[in-house]
Every structure is written in structure tokens, then in C-alpha cells.
């Protein structure tokens, strides 16, 4: 029985060999790298169900952060399933050929599945943070656009053989610098004005995100960019960063939101059994002549015009 269980080893690299469209990759993950990807996939999957389970304890109208956070780890679990299966990659000629046997060769496997993951999940991460800070939607959408620039330039740079890849790397770093600025300055101040509990939650999660995200360009530089470390080490490097940036971040964010009403952040969501007031609940018809309360703000708070 023990021999039978031991025989059930990871066979992904045999089923999906290191060849794509007739081109073989020289620098690839080994079984150890695949095993690590499976482990991260498992953590992402368990985290998804945990976040959804925590959401079930909230009213349906208060689950927005649970759904966004669960979506992040759900997408990541699929990406890590793909990479663990030795799929979602393409062989790219390296700019720097190394003598170290772990990174020796001409073609290195580049996991584009990782960038698809980031293209989908990093906007969700930023949405989590910026909605926590109560930032206006135009700012949220603009920061997401800058984030997409960062991810796409990273992918294009990884797929380029020549030194021009570092130009795309520079564009990506500039986009990252702007995102870190928004988190460290504008969003932090906005969250502080919403309330001390919101401010603490944002600082905790925003600081974690800013620090971890700054490490991604370093990983890119020694992996796809410089071909300095082996794909197995690349898997560990990116995997640890993703585990901190997604499930750990998600757990801290939801813990911080446990007593925060989303309505305080401008996220008042109507349930199916609630009445709709097109002009807001405080702008209902005031008399039979159709008079309305025109002294209410957009948030529904009444303002004395003579004050």
C-alpha cells in the first residue's frame, strides 16, 4: 500500500514536456518546481473557499470585499494549476547566457500564465485597497489603467530577447512608482479622513502591498530579465510574493473590515427587497405637489442652506 502511494508521484512534466510548437526549452522547472506550484495552488484554493465562507456570515449587501478578495485567490489558483502542470509558458531566447548549469542554455521557459493572473488580479487588489480608502471612482479607474500598463510592459519585456526588454522594464517600474505614491500618500490621507479604523486597515494592507510589490521588479530582473536564477528558484520567489500579496493580504483586509460598514465608504448596496428612491432616500416627494428636498447632498445628508 505504501509503495502504491509513493508511486503516485507528480507526473506533470512527463505529460506536458518542455516543448511548445516544436521548440524545446533548455531552462525549465523540475519536479521540485512543479511540486511548489501545486502547493501554492492548494493554498490559493483553500483561501478562496475561506473568504467565501467568511462572506456568508455577512449580509449580502456587505460582501463586496469578500467577493473581490475571493476572486483574487480563485484566479491565482487557476494560474498556479496551469504552471504546476507545466503549461501556460513559451520558450524565449535569453539575453544573457550563463555558465551555471542551472541556467545554462539558449531558451528559457517564460510563464505568460503568470502575467494573465496579474492582469486580472492586481486591479482587484487595488480595488480592494482604494475602495477601503473611499477613493473616488475616477481615481480608482485611472490607477487600474496604470496598473495594466505595468503588467503589460512586464510581459512584453519578458518576451523580448534583446536589451530593449529593459526599456519595457523601465516603463513598468515608472507605473509601479506612481501606484506606490497613490497608496502611500493620496489614498492613505483619504482613508484617514474616513475614520481611524478605516485608516488603520488601509495602512496595514496598503503598506504590505507597497512593500511586496516593490520586490516584484527584483524578481523579474533576476528571472525573466537577467536569467540569473533557475526556474525552480523563480517559482519560489514569485510564489512567496504571491502568497503574501493575495491570501495573507486578503485575510488582513477582511479582518480589518470586520466592523466597518461599507456604506461609510460610499458603498451602499441595495438588496432585492429594498425600495428604490431614484433621487436618494432623503429626496422623496415632500408633498402632494411633487416638492422635493433640494437641500440634500449626494450622500443623502441634509444641509442647511442658511448655515
Curated annotation (Swiss-Prot):
Source superkingdom: Eukaryota
InterPro entries: Arc/bac/fun_rhodopsins, Rhodopsin_retinal_BS, Yro2-like_7TM
Glycosylation sites (chain numbering): 28, 293
Induction data: The expression is subject to photoinduction. Expression is slightly induced after 2 hours of incubation at 42 degrees Celsius.
Signal peptide: none
GO biological process: phototransduction
Transmembrane segments: 36-56, 64-84, 118-138, 140-160, 166-186, 202-222, 235-255
Molecular function terms from GO: monoatomic ion channel activity; photoreceptor activity
GO-annotated cellular components: endoplasmic reticulum; plasma membrane
Keywords for the protein's UniProt record, in alphabetical order: Chromophore, Glycoprotein, Membrane, Photoreceptor protein, Receptor, Retinal protein, Sensory transduction, Stress response, Transmembrane, Transmembrane helix
Compartment(s) of residence: Membrane
Region described as Disordered: 280-307
Knocked-out gene: effects: Does not lead to any apparent phenotypic modification, including no change in the photoinduction of carotenoid biosynthesis.
Biased composition (Polar residues): 294-307
Membrane-protein topology: Multi-pass membrane protein
Described function: Opsin-like protein; part of the car gene cluster that mediates the biosynthesis of neurosporaxanthin, a carboxylic apocarotenoid acting as an essential protective pigments and leading to orange pigmentation. The exact role of carO in carotenoid biosynthesis is not known yet, but it could be involved in the regulation of the pathway by light or other stimuli.
Family: Belongs to the archaeal/bacterial/fungal opsin family.
Protein name listed in UniProt: Opsin-like protein carO
Gene (UniProt): carO
Amino acid at each position: 500500500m505504501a509503495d502504491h502511494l509513493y508511486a503516485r508521484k507528480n507526473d506533470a512534466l512527463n505529460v506536458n514536456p518542455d516543448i511548445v510548437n516544436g521548440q524545446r526549452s533548455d531552462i525549465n522547472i523540475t519536479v521540485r518546481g512543479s511540486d511548489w506550484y501545486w502547493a501554492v495552488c492548494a493554498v490559493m484554493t483553500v483561501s478562496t473557499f475561506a473568504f467565501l465562507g467568511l462572506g456568508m456570515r455577512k449580509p449580502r449587501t456587505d460582501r463586496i470585499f469578500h467577493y473581490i478578495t475571493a476572486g483574487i485567490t480563485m484566479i491565482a489558483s487557476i494560474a498556479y494549476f496551469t504552471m504546476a502542470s507545466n503549461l501556460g509558458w513559451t520558450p524565449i531566447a535569453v539575453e544573457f547566457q550563463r555558465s551555471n548549469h542551472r541556467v545554462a542554455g539558449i531558451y528559457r521557459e517564460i510563464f505568460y500564465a503568470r502575467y494573465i493572473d496579474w492582469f486580472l488580479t492586481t486591479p482587484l487588489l487595488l480595488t480592494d485597497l482604494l475602495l477601503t480608502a473611499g477613493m473616488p471612482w475616477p481615481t480608482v479607474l485611472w490607477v487600474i489603467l496604470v496598473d495594466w500598463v505595468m503588467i503589460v510592459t512586464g510581459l512584453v519585456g519578458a518576451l523580448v530577447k534583446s536589451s530593449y526588454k529593459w526599456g519595457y522594464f523601465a516603463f513598468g517600474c515608472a507605473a509601479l512608482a506612481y501606484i506606490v505614491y497613490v497608496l502611500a500618500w493620496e489614498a492613505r490621507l483619504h482613508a484617514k479622513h474616513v475614520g481611524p479604523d478605516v485608516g488603520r486597515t488601509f495602512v496595514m494592507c496598503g503598506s504590505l502591498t507597497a512593500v511586496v510589490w516593490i520586490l516584484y521588479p527584483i524578481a523579474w530582473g533576476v528571472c525573466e530579465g537577467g536569467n540569473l536564477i533557475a526556474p525552480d528558484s523563480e517559482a519560489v520567489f514569485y510564489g512567496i510574493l504571491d502568497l503574501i500579496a493575495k491570501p495573507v493580504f486578503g485575510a488582513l483586509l477582511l479582518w480589518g473590515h470586520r466592523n466597518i460598514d461599507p456604506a461609510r465608504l460610499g458603498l451602499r448596496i441595495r438588496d432585492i427587497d429594498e425600495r428604490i428612491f431614484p433621487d436618494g432616500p432623503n429626496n422623496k416627494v415632500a408633498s402632494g405637489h411633487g416638492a422635493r428636498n433640494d437641500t440634500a447632498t449626494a450622500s443623502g445628508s441634509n444641509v442647511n442652506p442658511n448655515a
